[in-house]
Amino acid sequence: MAAAPTQIEAELYYLIARFLQSGPCNKSAQVLVQELEEHQLIPRRLDWEGKEHRRSFEDLVAANAHIPPDYLLKICERIGPLLDKEIPQSVPGVQTLLGVGRQSLLRDAKDCKSTLWNGSAFAALHRGRPPELPVNYVKPPNVVNITSARQLTGCSRFGHIFPSSAYQHIKMHKRILGHLSSVYCVAFDRSGRRIFTGSDDCLVKIWATDDGRLLATLRGHSAEISDMAVNYENTLIAAGSCDKVVRVWCLRTCAPVAVLQGHSASITSIQFCPSTKGTNRYLTSTGADGTICFWQWHVKTMKFRDRPVKFTERSRPGVQISCSSFSSGGMFITTGSTDHVIRIYYLGSEVPEKIAELESHTDKVVAVQFCNNGDSLRFVSGSRDGTARIWQYQQQEWKSIVLDMATKMTGNNLPSGEDKITKLKVTMVAWDRYDTTVITAVNNFLLKVWNSITGQLLHTLSGHDDEVFVLEAHPFDQRIILSAGHDGNIFIWDLDRGTKIRNYFNMIEGQGHGAVFDCKFSPDGNHFACTDSHGHLLLFGFGCSKYYEKIPDQMFFHTDYRPLIRDANNYVLDEQTQQAPHLMPPPFLVDVDGNPHPTKFQRLVPGRENCKDEQLIPQLGYVANGDGEVVEQVIGQQTNDQDESILDGIIRELQREQDLRLINEGDVPHLPVNRAYSVNGALRSPNMDISSSPNIRLRRHSSQIEGVRQMHNNAPRSQMATERDLMAWSRRVVVNELNNGVSRVQEECRTAKGDIEISLYTVEKKKKPSYTTQRNDYEPSCGRSLRRTQRKRQHTYQTRSNIEHNSQASCQNSGVQEDSDSSSEEDETVGTSDASVEDPVVEWQSESSSSDSSSEYSDWTADAGINLQPPKRQTRQTTRKICSSSDEENLKSLEERQKKPKQTRKKKGGLVSIAGEPNEEWFAPQWILDTIPRRSPFVPQMGDELIYFRQGHEAYVRAVRKSKIYSVNLQKQPWNKMDLREQEFVKIVGIKYEVGPPTLCCLKLAFLDPISGKMTGESFSIKYHDMPDVIDFLVLHQFYNEAKERNWQIGDRFRSIIDDAWWFGTVESQQPFQPEYPDSSFQCYSVHWDNNEREKMSPWDMEPIPEGTAFPDEVGAGVPVSQEELTALLYKPQEGEWGAHSRDEECERVIQGINHLLSLDFASPFAVPVDLSAYPLYCTVVAYPTDLNTIRRRLENRFYRRISALMWEVRYIEHNARTFNEPDSPIVKAAKIVTDVLLRFIGDQSCTDILDTYNKIKAEERNSTDAEEDTEIVDLDSDGPGTSSGRKVKCRGRRQSLKCNPDAWKKQCKELLSLIYEREDSEPFRQPADLLSYPGHQEQEGESSESVVPERQQDSSLSEDYQDVIDTPVDFSTVKETLEAGNYGSPLEFYKDVRQIFNNSKAYTSNKKSRIYSMMLRLSALFESHIKNIISEYKSAIQSQKRRRPRYRKRLRSSSSSLSSSGAPSPKGKQKQMKLQPKNDQNTSVSHARTSSPFSSPVSDAAEGLSLYLLDDEPDGPFSSSSFGGYSRSGNSHDPGKAKSFRNRVLPVKQDHSLDGPLTNGDGREPRTGIKRKLLSASEEDENMGGEDKEKKETKEKSHLSTSESGELGSSLSSESTCGSDSDSESTSRTDQDYVDGDHDYSKFIQTRPKRKLRKQHGNGKRNWKTRGTGGRGRWGRWGRWSRGGRGRGGRGRGSRGRGGGGTRGRGRGRGGRGASRGATRAKRARIADDEFDTMFSGRFSRLPRIKTRNQGRRTVLYNDDSDNDNFVSTEDPLNLGTSRSGRVRKMTEKARVSHLMGWNY
């Protein structure tokens, strides 16, 4: 008898028997039951006495009736998932009971421990190859082991020696703006040395991969570039365009090779065939006309046949071939079409032939891709039916494996919201390098990785936030694939692990993110290039970005957008020069605004590398435009002298004579005979009406002048090549051919692949066909097409060629733009000095990391040679404008960094000692006060060229932290903010000293090019002080070069100065101080001193021992240093550093000048250092004390290394006086005079009498006494020194008057509006919208909606009326008339209306990539950049006016018990919490009648996020002026007499209050209803009331307010009830610094605790505005729909501008009834209601943070941060989009809800 089983065993036997009984093994179950009873293996039962009894199997079943027969199976199914939670298996989702290792159900943590190999295991070989790592080998193997194994075996696995984690080191080298429109195409040449970009601006550009230089521009296309291809021989590039033409250029010379015209619609794809059969090759192109063309060309002669082999594949009208792909051997090409059919063509025979049509897909085929290797005939196709198919040719047919995008990973949950897409569509497909996996991109933003053999889903990759249209496999690493999409994200993925390695977000400052449209890897895999929607080229790669630092961020050739003329064969010539574009001489490099780059950048242009400086400055003369005005002269360097030299005139005259002679001789047949010349002799084109092709609009930044495009009007003789130039230029090589060996190997490889393909095809064709075909059908659906197909669909309104004629006038007028802020700022800066264009002042500000204005005094003298005019102090405004927003953040962070150490250090001790004298630790250290020049410690001077050693700086920081001298933020050190090498060549461009203890020296260091010595444009800041036992980490470049030339060897004897004595030693060895910096010279020598000590030394601290040197008497002792030796070791001035004279001559001249200056009484206070016993606090305020005597002693000792260092210290005399004393005190004025006199004397090297200079300055001051009243004093708290001329800024009088004039904003707004009108982007928004052009109206009229506004109709909301989407239509013509009528009360009202135009644009257009949306964004950026200055100056004027008010007004305000409208802050601790309860009376839904737009909803920046307008499909005509902008309504579209009422809506937002919070009724209390009604009715009589009477009236009204409501904040209804009240203007003058660039955040406030929500209250009053008439159309008619109580909807009538409001008359259709409008009453009421909105406006801003979204152009909540909604929203469902005009609630998508609740993640 067997042993009694345990309870578990008995139960297991029972479960097994039950399981067998329920299955097919019933006999086995019976046998098992018998054996269980026989061996008594059935568990026994117990009775109530505890006795055991045997029982049968049936009894056991009855006792366990709750156990089903499959209970054992369920237990086994549950074990695996439960175990996975504790110890995951190696292959997720695999359920097995028989696994081993990590798949075993008996696994534990010990069994799953990761394996580690020793070094010898890597050296093993398995079948001649290194073994694969085990699955549980977690981290990558050690590179040392792999390298050692490779040395032993001679081979290694690529995955071992280069782990996928290495791709984390890829970084963006440069982002270059090179196009004016979206760039959809990018490609590398076959060598990887060149990059090609094709853009919607019709240009193809060639770039250098290694350094990012722009090498050439290929012109000729007249529409968007849709695709590009480079042939395999690397000799040709072909580009297809929406102009139906394929152009082919020679890569070597950029000469056009062929213009292929065989399509009748846009080109959709273009490819060179890889086939190598014979000398005839093929170029294929597919088009939107449903055709594919095979263009034959000869590989040797590069001649193309005119007629292609063409296949027209149009199964029905409208079919397009959207994509194509060649097999790797070139024998097959497959195409995908919009008719759901895949077609395959065979090129193995004499002519191409179609061999198959595959119709398995049920929707458009958007992507096809052949596999990369020729060992199988496979390709993948992706369709909008939600599937991809892997096709393979087998047994005479193409069989497919279906990849269903709805498939999910087992045990993997999708991210929330990703599976909400109702219909999945494939957007892109790709293979990995070795064809083991297929990657598909889906419209739910996921990437899916599939096994290419079985079709199994391997990984789901999530991370993108928008659709992905770019999938690019690594050229040789099968693990790596790159993806990019419209969300601006670029990801590098590891396909083996299904993980993200690296990602980059393409955020463009001030413009949101840029959608990435194309990416390509270089052939060697070291780089990849991307292009985006904003015209940028992004270069990524491994290694250092040093070479990319030499190029500017914006690179255009000035000839890029010149007009072209075309011959009958569509070849082009430059219109101005009559030359082929590739034969024109080297162009000039300009930025996006058309401004030439400095000469150092001009040498980047091929052909200009060796030009002299004067040859690099473009001299483009005056050219008359279409209006008879002159184009602004574009030169490389603006000077005050505009008179051209006589030589220039002579040269131009000779050029003109030569042109005429050549014409007469007939040598230049294409030279235009009718060329005219202007007065100055510059070339004038007689045919200026021909617009540029392409006609491009600039979209860049705020100062959008037509810069690059205006350059085409300037074509002087200097840009017309001579015969010799043409010969030299034709010999240039832009793109090299492949090396013969490389080319031969590649061709052999392609030949072999082609042979294999033919062989496979032949074999499979002979096999017996199979009759079982795998095929799945899916429901058809319509959705988004592939990128290129989509672009073709948008072409009707995106292309600029369709509107070319319409934009000619604005093109001609663009040349006279002079309103650019950047230009004016540059003039103000450069005008102060005739320095070179490498202006360190601008560079300091463009990368500001110091808050001190002393940084603005840089070494211009060193760059300018003999030019000694000192740089003037710039105004604060100039500095702020030059800096970007990110720079300002760095500025603030550095200010905090500088303040914190000060506070920390000051805690060490008191300011003054017990004896009353200053504490010694506050004294300036000796190394700063020293007047004798020394090599060490290093004392910085302006203009010093240094070698910065990172190791030494790190050692200094460690010493400071160890000694706790002051707090140091490691994160803000330069090596943590940028990539620094071990040693950098830098230049001091800014110096500032911080008060101690200890006194710190802050330096601004600009990078210098090691070769040219010019500044690269980047810089960083450091702060340090001299510390004992800490070696200098800044070494003068001169000393460094001398030390490097000595080349110390082991055993060499040297000497070194330590404590003013020579010490001797021997070089023992040379090795890097730290292994991680192997190339650094810092302390790289190990030396043995004669006193037997050993130490690390730097070569510049070691001096050779000259012959005849006296050695010490005792070995190891020192020898005193003589004065001659010290002098010989000092810095030797370079040529030009002291002007035209030598240092000795200049020093003696200035010493004599100082001596004479000290004879004057006003200079005596500055003769000697300040007496610290008399002024003990002086050293706690002034960090760098100096005086005339100190300067004189330093001059005597030749302390200064250059004249700019001397001038910098002279400025500190005035700076210190200004810092310590009152600004207007006599001592400061005296210091100003001393500084001015001395600086002018130093600057004029011919002057020897300083008293004469003093008399001249005094005379100038007397003459300019009146003018000084109009100058503005710059910030007196700045820490930097400056001259008096630095305080007085030229042309400040006008700006000061503007700041003091509260009405100056009106003129400024008119100028801004004129500027907007000059932009072509404003054209769609100038006039009201024509409802005939919008779908909702067409449906009502029964018209066809197919031909109008195609974009909106692709939307699901086709039935939505324009009026349902746009509650508040407005256009620029309305704004302009309102502004001219004087109906705006403040610039904020003007701002609201213009913002409403942009909000409407966002709300209506559904396609964020549409051209109209881009136009709106550019126009909005332009507007925001100008309006913030207008509002800022308006605020200043209002506050200035308040300061001049009588005192009794202040008493009135001060008597208020709560926060007054004056904005004066309450005492801390006494500020009261106030609640805002705006009451909605009859006029609440009316905004201001001043805008003639009584709309109800508040102006909001956060509308629904979609653009407003679309262009009509008018290819040859201009814009329809009625198709954009506002809104007009047909009076016949509705039944007359049916007046429609609308509800008022108030935003349910919480209100925050601040010290400078929203406006109140004078005393901070909310008016009662009676008071409010009184204010409304009394607004009219205020119009004729004088200012004094109004003040009295206001006081009287205030006295009636109830004191019981003092705790509440009024609704600001009295803000404009009287003209004498300043509350309205105060509402717009919160804080000037709250303006930010980007999303227009103009109303930030100090946030406090929010109170309660606003309550929606409806008024019952009737409106007074009515229109009259019955017919016609006009602008005001569109406002009629907001009228209540009218007697009809239709009709001709006079609008609110007609009467009473002082405005113009408007005639149009409206819904309002008959009757005259009461303009004045409405205007006043509207102002009051608008002020109520102002309170809400500011309240929302105080509540909301600044929110950025990546869903630009989508209808989502919180697109901008100006408001939440513009409709009343139910509190039960706050996440919706408000209600439409018809009352329908606009629901938010689930994704938008998640985004709103969770916030946007970057």
Curated annotation (Swiss-Prot):
Point out residues bearing the modification Phosphoserine.
Answer: S693, S703, S885, S886, S1577, S1579, S1763
Repeat found in the keyword field: yes
UniProt signal peptide: none
Q: Where is the composition biased (Low complexity)?
A: 846-859, 1454-1468, 1520-1533, 1601-1626
**What residue spans carry the Basic and acidic residues bias annotation?**
889-898, 1587-1600, 1627-1643
Q: Where along the chain is composition biased (Polar residues)?
A: 796-817, 1479-1499
Q: Which SMART domains match?
A: BROMO, WD40
User: What is one process in the GO biological process aspect for this record?
Assistant: regulation of cell shape
Q: What is the effect of changing K1596E?
A: In XLID93; uncertain significance
Q: Where is the composition biased (Acidic residues)?
A: 818-829, 1266-1278
Q: Give the keywords, sorted.
A: Bromodomain, Chromosomal rearrangement, Disease variant, Intellectual disability, Phosphoprotein, Repeat, WD repeat
Span list, region Disordered: 768-910, 1262-1292, 1326-1361, 1438-1500, 1520-1725
Q: In which tissues is it expressed?
A: Found in most adult tissues. Down-regulated in a majority of the B-CLL cases examined.
- Which residues lie in Basic residues bias regions? 785-795, 899-909, 1441-1453, 1649-1666, 1684-1697
Q: Where are the WD repeats?
A: 170-209, 213-251, 255-297, 307-347, 353-393, 400-452, 456-495, 502-542
GO (cellular component) term, any one = nucleus
- Annotated Bromo domain ranges read 1138-1245, 1300-1430
CDD domains (UniProt xref)? Bromo_WDR9_I_like, WD40
Magnesium is among the record's keywords: no
Report the protein's function.
Answer: Plays a role in the regulation of cell morphology and cytoskeletal organization. Required in the control of cell shape.
Quote the protein name from its UniProt record: Bromodomain and WD repeat-containing protein 3
Q: Native species of this protein?
A: Homo sapiens
Organism taxonomic ancestry = Eukaryota, Metazoa, Chordata, Craniata, Vertebrata
Q: Which gene encodes it?
A: BRWD3
